[in-house]
A protein has these predicted regions:
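Intrinsically disordered, low-complexity regions enriched in acidic/Ser/Thr/Pro/Gln residues
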Residues: 1-128, 132-133, 137-139, 144
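Feature captures the catalytic cores and cofactor-binding loops of soluble hydro-lyases/lyases
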Residues: 147-222, 227-230
Length: 230
């Protein structure tokens, strides 16, 4: 998928087709191009995998500021941020809550899996899901790249902002996943595998709660312990 701003190509995403509009909106938000969906209008399908980012009236973006001479690959998700300092510029203030129990968190990956139709069919898709503080599923999206799945979730959030919510991802909590959660204002991120050292560093500096190895009756809280109840 090629994304353009004012006809200027700014990114090529290697993604699984489906929820394309959510992906474009979420990508624009988590990359700091806009501060939220109110600055966006409907993306325009130009055909042949090319899309124009729709901007609300009065919103001006310099496409050269975000133009990238690289592919965001499905494996690494290099999404235009070269350093933690760059992410901190885009990240806002995270909600102080919610406070959730580790018992609640341990149930969420299984609830997400119940809605992973693509994974059930292929065994090859990652997923991301957004839950409220009570553990109710709000959104689930799938993609070959978990960072794309996160963008699809962010782009589908209604109402905005996400507020006191929990993001769950299949696999590890990478730097890109932590980056996207911080910029979108999602305070808790959980993964079924480990968190990377760079993700933990970013989380510590932004106040993000990162929880890994959420499997069965166990989990590891890396950062933001104050949001997790015993």
């Amino acid at each position: 998928m090629e994304i353009r701003i004012r006809s200027v190509p700014i990114a090529v995403l290697m993604r699984t087709p489906g929820a394309d509009r959510d992906l474009i909106r979420g990508f624009a938000i988590t990359e700091g191009m806009v501060v939220g969906p109110r600055e966006l209008s409907e993306p325009i399908d130009l055909g042949e995998g090319r899309w124009e980012l729709g901007l609300a009236d009065g919103v001006e973006i310099d496409p050269e500021q975000f133009r990238r001479n690289l592919y965001a690959s499905s494996s690494c998700g290099v999404c235009g941020k070269a350093s933690i300092d760059a992410v901190l510029v885009s990240a806002g203030t995270l909600p102080t809550g919610p406070r959730v129990s580790h018992h609640l968190l341990e149930r969420l990956p299984g609830m997400m899996l119940d809605h992973q139709e693509g994974f059930a069919s292929t065994g090859g898709l990652h997923a991301a899901a957004l839950f409220d503080a009570a553990g109710h599923l709000r959104i689930v999206r799938e993609d070959i790249g978990r960072h794309n799945a996160v963008d699809k979730v962010v782009g589908a959030v209604e109402p905005w902002p996400p507020g006191e919510s929990v993001l769950v991802v299949s696999g590890r909590v990478s730097f890109e996943v932590a980056q996207k959660a911080a910029v979108a204002g999602i305070p808790i991120v959980c993964g079924v595998s480990a968190a990377s050292s760079l993700a933990i560093d970013l989380a510590s500096r932004t106040g993000l709660t990162v929880v890994g190895f959420v499997r069965g009756d166990r989990c590891v809280v890396y950062t933001g312990h104050d949001r997790i109840e015993p």
